[in-house]
Amino acid sequence: MQEAPLMLKNKTARRIKDIPGFVFPGGVKVIINFTVDFDAMIFRKFLREPKLWCAQGEFGGRTGLWRLLDVFGEFDVRTTLFLPGQTGLLYPEVLRRAVREGHEVANHMWDHHIPPTLEEEAVHMDRTDTLIKGLTGQYPAGTRSEHDLAALRDHAYTYVSYTPQGEFPFYVYYENIGKWMLKLPLSFIHDDAMFFYFGW
């Protein structure tokens, strides 16, 4: 077991702790975790842009996620959809289908940015959590967002999946809120957003 002090952006010390004796269940050697950041249209629809511009961003909600769910169903794969709340307002039907088919829906901010104040951040988190509960019947278990620690303290998330810090799950202890959080690393290399950042 290793513990190492690190510094966060807000100068708060934390400790990282590997999960002792961690093994995947059932003798599995490798696990691939499929997640979808369902960010469709949040940068366009609410800006009241011209219709032709908006049409470029409609694919994810009108077609893309539906097709992904078809593929996941064909291969009996369950995944996690990280949802900005505004996207949930725009495309509730595809999310209801995802829930019916056993997929998890988790918090990915309200409009894909972290507000400048804790008060606004708490409002955004609550709005997204409430919307997800309305769609799924339960509050989300995790988040993919760089939320302030003080904001995380008041939410019942069991995991955070935001940074590519390793290959295996691990725990992080946040000193100023006295709470351990499970970290599920991600890989930006396999994130298709990398290919589109400069085109939008």
Where are these regions (language model features)?
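Catalytic alpha-helical scaffold of carbohydrate-active enzymes acting on polysaccharides/glycoconjugates
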Residues: 2-189
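Catalytic grooves of carbohydrate-active enzymes
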Residues: 187-200
